[in-house]
Amino acid sequence: MAKLTKRMRVIRDKVEVTKEYEINEAVALLKELATAKFVESVDVAVNLGIDARKSDQNVRGATVLPHGTGRDIRVAVFTQGANAEAAKAAGADIVGMEDLAEQVKKGEMNFDVVVASPDAMRVVGQLGTILGPRGLMPNPKVGTVTPNVAEAVKNAKAGQVRYRNDKNGIIHTTIGKASFEANQLQENLEALLVALKKAKPSSAKGTFLKKVSISTTMGAGVTVDQASLDTQAN
């Protein structure tokens, strides 16, 4: 049997696997256990009441978290003309068309999000095998293929998170850093859950948000009592 590290022993002793923690208690516990030498991310896993095998029940979208993610997001934009100037003014890091496509083909991809105007998809479409596996392919469902590229850039820079369920019907994404204030993490989580509820497929029956767990990069998952959250849409 593998020997538990000191960190793993502390987590085992502190976290009750079967317990649902109120959000303030859950966040306090994560912060206490976030002892890595770097600032850990706070991640969330949401088990959805969907049949992921059915395409009409899959959930995909994006939402801007009120307190961002704590990451400095680099945005590349495929567009031209006035849209290119608007993208630069909005804070885009790289803007181009064929020239940007050539960079991508060479493996020069120093960016986290790719945005494209509809007229640029003739260029971006050729990059699917490169951008797709990296989760960078622009998609209208998450607002990254849009005529309003400036807004998409601002959203990405402001801390927009994209989400889609995996084959087990679970959403995995980030809601910030362990260095965030407790209320910031709570409000980010609540904003994400509100967005997910709005994205509930009409064909999904029964309880939609079945389980919500939060964890840090190096820590254990803590299940959150949803009754301690405000997930009513305004």
Swiss-Prot record:
GO function terms (MF aspect): rRNA binding; structural constituent of ribosome; tRNA binding
Pfam hit, one: Ribosomal_L1
GO terms for biological process, alphabetical: regulation of translation; translation
Keywords assigned: Repressor, Ribonucleoprotein, Ribosomal protein, RNA-binding, rRNA-binding, Translation regulation, tRNA-binding
Source species, domain of life: Bacteria
HAMAP family attached to this UniProt entry: Ribosomal_uL1_B
Name this polypeptide is given: Large ribosomal subunit protein uL1
Organism expressing this protein natively: Vibrio atlanticus (strain LGP32) (Vibrio splendidus (strain Mel32))
